[in-house]
Amino acid sequence: MTIFNAVDKFTMMSGDRVKIKDLLSSRLTECGWRDEVRLLCRSILQEKGAISSFTVEQLVTEVTPRARSLVPDAVKKELLIKIRTIFDENEDDDIDPEDA
Amino acid sequence: MPTSAAPVPAVAAQSPTTRKAIANNFRELTKDPKKLDEAANQLYESLLEDAVTGIFIEVHHLRKIGNLSALDGVAEESAHRICDVPNLDIFGVSTAKKAIDCTCPNCDRLVAAARFAPHLEKCMGMGRISSRIASRRLATKEGTSASSNSSYVHSGANAGGTDDEDDVDWSSDKRKKKSTQNSRNNGSKKNNGKTF
């Protein structure tokens, strides 16, 4: 988790996290992933909504893996490449002020 | 789990050392391409998780408000479908004009429904104009001589034809003049009113 923490903090600090997040959400909206997941949630709710013990947490655990697999490969690849380029850029950028 | 946005300003504002530490951590990480890949994947996963959570919140909100079912909409009933058959209107009713005729209870003539009310008014001598005509007719009947009456009948034959024929024209079976006697009488009534 330390790797992730470092990355997370760093991207937040540089403001790249917001950029990537915006890109991802716009891509997901474009390809209809949002609607698909929303539909999935609704169909599950229609099945199990009547059960009073059905909680939001249960819904989340049920939908999240499926939602993850629903993401188109193209979007995932684009995002990963984008993240990598941002990492590379930051690597170059930050060395200079550090040294100076 | 991705940390929330709240601690970011705190981290950034704390001191240059923490900033430096974060940058250092990151730089160390970038040296190892394997770790970098892992980091990229993790970042992607966390962002995706954020997106899913956003949808959950949205759906949850809609559900609590009661708008979730509204999104589904209501299935269109076949009864309300627009009918697309030739010669039928959108409700599936024939477009052919149905002529509705009414039989006048006073003179037993068939009159088109649209003309029935004016006809009845005239035929039964009711209404503003008709009653005026009727009262004048009563007044004239007392005072008129036989010679003047005959002249009215003659002049009425010319003018009366058009007036009474309205009813006949509008009647759907297009009956022609029922009787000359009838039109003459009607015409004379009308004409009486006009001349006075």
From Swiss-Prot, chain A:
Belongs to the ENY2 family. Involved in mRNA export coupled transcription activation by association with both the AMEX and the SAGA complexes. The SAGA complex is a multiprotein complex that activates transcription by remodeling chromatin and mediating histone acetylation and deubiquitination. Within the SAGA complex, participates in a subcomplex that specifically deubiquitinates histone H2B. The SAGA complex is recruited to specific gene promoters by activators, where it is required for transcription. Required for nuclear receptor-mediated transactivation. One of its GO terms (cellular component) is nuclear pore. It holds the Pfam family EnY2. One of its GO terms (molecular function) is TFIID-class transcription factor complex binding. The gene is e(y)2. Component of the nuclear pore complex (NPC)-associated AMEX complex (anchoring and mRNA export complex), composed of at least e(y)2 and xmas-2. Component of the SAGA transcription coactivator-HAT complexes, at least composed of Ada2b, e(y)2, Pcaf/Gcn5, Taf10 and Nipped-A/Trrap. Within the SAGA complex, e(y)2, Sgf11, and not/nonstop form an additional subcomplex of SAGA called the DUB module (deubiquitination module). Component of the THO complex, composed of at least e(y)2, HPR1, THO2, THOC5, THOC6 and THOC7. Interacts with e(y)1. Interacts with su(Hw) (via zinc fingers). GO terms for biological process: heterochromatin boundary formation; mRNA export from nucleus; poly(A)+ mRNA export from nucleus; positive regulation of transcription by RNA polymerase II; protein transport; transcription elongation by RNA polymerase II. This is Enhancer of yellow 2 transcription factor. Keywords: Activator, Chromatin regulator, Cytoplasm, mRNA transport, Nucleus, Protein transport, Transcription, Transcription regulation, Translocation, Transport. The keyword Protein transport applies. It comes from the Eukaryota. Its main location: nucleus. The keyword RNA-binding does not apply. It is found in: Nucleus, Nucleoplasm; Cytoplasm. Disulfide bonds: none annotated.
From Swiss-Prot, chain B:
Keywords: Activator, Chromatin regulator, Cytoplasm, Metal-binding, mRNA transport, Nucleus, Phosphoprotein, Protein transport, Transcription, Transcription regulation, Translocation, Transport, Zinc, Zinc-finger. The modification Phosphoserine is found at residue 172. It is found in: Nucleus, Nucleoplasm; Cytoplasm. Residues 142-153 have a biased composition (Polar residues). InterPro entries: SAGA_su_Sgf11 (IPR013246), SGF11 (IPR051078). GO terms for molecular function: transcription coactivator activity; zinc ion binding. The keyword Phosphoprotein applies. Residues 182-196 have a biased composition (Low complexity). Its main location: nucleus. Component of the transcription regulatory histone acetylation (HAT) complex SAGA, a multiprotein complex that activates transcription by remodeling chromatin and mediating histone acetylation and deubiquitination. Within the SAGA complex, participates in a subcomplex that specifically deubiquitinates histone H2B. The SAGA complex is recruited to specific gene promoters by activators, where it is required for transcription. Required for nuclear receptor-mediated transactivation. Binds independently on SAGA to promoters in an RNA-dependent manner. The long N-terminal helix forms part of the 'assembly lobe' of the SAGA deubiquitination module. This is SAGA-associated factor 11 homolog. It comes from Drosophila persimilis (Fruit fly).
